[in-house]
C-alpha cells in the first residue's frame, strides 16, 4: 500500500513513519508549518525523511494558524505544565488542526495516486483532543469517501488510535526508531523541558514500555509527581 505519512517530527509520527517503511510502501512524509512555537520539530521530520530515503514536503499554513487564536501552541499563551489528562491541557488545543491537515493530506494523496494517508493519533490524545478520537477518524474517512468519490480511493491509516503512547514506544523500538531523533516538547527550547504535557507523557511512555529514554530533559524527574494521580488507562 503506497502511503503518505503526516509527520510532525514527534515521537509518534516518526515511529509511524518507520512502521510504514517496514510494513508498507512509504511514498513520502508530509509536514505542516502552522506557526507552532515548537517549529523545530519540523527539522526532525526532515531528518526522518532523509534517513528513510523518501521525499519530504512542508506545507505552509501559517496564515491559517494565525486565525486559530487562543492556543498555547500558536498564540501568546503559556504552555501549561503537568499531565495530559489535566483540564489545563486544553490550552494546547488548536481548533480543527487535524481536520485541516488531513484534508490537505488527502488532496495530496489523491493527486499523487497514493493509497493511504497515515496519522499517528493515539489513545493518550483522546482526553484532550477531539480530532484524535476513533469517532473522528471514522467520520473523516466517511467524509473523504464522499469528497473523492469517483476520483480516488484513499484510506486513512491510524494504527495507534486505540493504543497508548507506551505501545507506540514499544512498536517504535521494534522498528528501530531512533527516539533521540524525535522532538516532543511544546515549549520549543534547546532541550525538552520535562514539564509540559507532552514531555511528561513522553517520559511516562518510555517508563511504561520498559524502553530506555535517550531524551535530555531540563527537569527529568517532574514526570513522577505529574503522573502520580493518573494511570495510562485513564487517559486512553
Swiss-Prot record:
Superkingdom as given in the UniProt entry: Bacteria
Annotated metabolic or biological route of this protein: Purine metabolism; 7-cyano-7-deazaguanine biosynthesis
GO molecular function: ATP binding; ligase activity, forming carbon-nitrogen bonds; zinc ion binding
Binding residues annotated for ATP, in chain numbering: 7-17
Entry keywords, A to Z: ATP-binding, Ligase, Metal-binding, Nucleotide-binding, Plasmid, Queuosine biosynthesis, Zinc
Cofactor note (record): Binds 1 zinc ion per subunit.
Matches recorded under InterPro entries: QueC (IPR018317), Rossmann-like_a/b/a_fold (IPR014729)
Catalytic activity: 7-carboxy-7-deazaguanine + NH4(+) + ATP = 7-cyano-7-deazaguanine + ADP + phosphate + H2O + H(+)
EC number(s) reported in the record: 6.3.4.20
HAMAP family: QueC
Similarity comment: family membership: Belongs to the QueC family.
Entry-linked NCBIfam families: 7-cyano-7-deazaguanine synthase QueC
PANTHER family: 7-CYANO-7-DEAZAGUANINE SYNTHASE (PTHR42914:SF1)
Job description of the protein: Catalyzes the ATP-dependent conversion of 7-carboxy-7-deazaguanine (CDG) to 7-cyano-7-deazaguanine (preQ(0)).
Protein name: 7-cyano-7-deazaguanine synthase
Source species: Rhizobium meliloti (strain 1021)
Species lineage: Bacteria, Pseudomonadati, Pseudomonadota, Alphaproteobacteria, Hyphomicrobiales
Amino acid at each position: 500500500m503506497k502511503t503518505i505519512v503526516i509527520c510532525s517530527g514527534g515521537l509518534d509520527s516518526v515511529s509511524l513513519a518507520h512502521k510504514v517503511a517496514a510494513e508498507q510502501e512509504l511514498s513520502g512524509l508530509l509536514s505542516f508549518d502552522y506557526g507552532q512555537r515548537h517549529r523545530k520539530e519540523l527539522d526532525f521530520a526532515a531528518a526522518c525523511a532523509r534517513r528513510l530515503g523518501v521525499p519530504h514536503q512542508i506545507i505552509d499554513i501559517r496564515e491559517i494558524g494565525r486565525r486559530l487564536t487562543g492556543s498555547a501552541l500558536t498564540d501568546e499563551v503559556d504552555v501549561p505544565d503537568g499531565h495530559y489528562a489535566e483540564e489545563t491541557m486544553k490550552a494546547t488545543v488548536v481548533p480543527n488542526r487535524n481536520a485541516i491537515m488531513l484534508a490537505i493530506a488527502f488532496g495530496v494523496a489523491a493527486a499523487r495516486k497514493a493509497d493511504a494517508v497515515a496519522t499517528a493519533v493515539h489513545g493518550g490524545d483522546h482526553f484532550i483532543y477531539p480530532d484524535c478520537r476513533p469517532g473522528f477518524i471514522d467520520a473523516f474517512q466517511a467524509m473523504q469517501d464522499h469528497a473523492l468519490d469517483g476520483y480516488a480511493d484513499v484510506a486513512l491509516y491510524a494504527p495507534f488510535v486505540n493504543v497508548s503512547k507506551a505501545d507506540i514506544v514499544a512498536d517504535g523500538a521494534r522498528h528501530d526508531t531512533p527516539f533521540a531523533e524525535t522532538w516532543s516538547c511544546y515549549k520549543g527550547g534547546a532541550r525538552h523541558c520535562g514539564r509540559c504535557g507532552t514531555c511528561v507523557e513522553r517520559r511516562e511512555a518510555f517508563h511504561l514500555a520498559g524502553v530506555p529514554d535517550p531524551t535530555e530533559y531540563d527537569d527529568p524527574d517532574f514526570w513522577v509527581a505529574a503522573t502520580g494521580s493518573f494511570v495510562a488507562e485513564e487517559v486512553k
